[in-house]
Amino acid sequence: MRIIGGEWRGRKIEEPRGRDVTRPTTDRVREACASMVMSAFDFDLDEVRVLDAFGGSGALGIEMLSRGARSLITFEIDRNAARLITKNIESLCRDRSRWRVVTGDVLASASRGRVPGGPFDLVLLDPPYAFGAAPVEELLRNLAQQGLLAPGAFALFEHAASDAGAHPAGFETVREKRYGITSVDLLRWVAADECDHANDSDIDEDVPLEDTHE
């Protein structure tokens, strides 16, 4: 697998091995996702804080870093996959203050407000297709309620085209695209005034979560 665009364009990253460990996004869909994000932020990610909620291969979050995102927090529940994401980012980005990989359940962490690096301007949501929209809606609600979303934050949700997209309260659907068996929805949080944004934590906040290091 290679990085498609940005500073590290053409650089190789490793993919997790074994069936059912992750479902890496295809190059075509990854490029489409990146284009949607770049357009949403007027092609400038310099101040964008990214949460990759279901890291998987980590490729989509790495694409955002490559294209200039200010910071990236990646959650991945599978320990081996999280280690590989860490290895991949370490091979590309020497600035350790820009990223963090957390081995853990993002749903549980968000419900307790224990997600470092927020408030986020962009949330990447690429869970296993069997996951469904309901947990994604719950995650976005919790992120909003815990002050972990910046005003006007975007969320990018990749899901099976045969399944319904996510429609959590307080979000509007900006764009929907279909690529074969995959659909990608871009959502925007429009209810910022209803939530308290006091939790403006730094990326190295002392949060009792498990970081992954090689």
Question: What are these language model-derived features?
Answer:
Residues M1-E214:
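Class I S-adenosyl-L-methionine-dependent methyltransferase catalytic core
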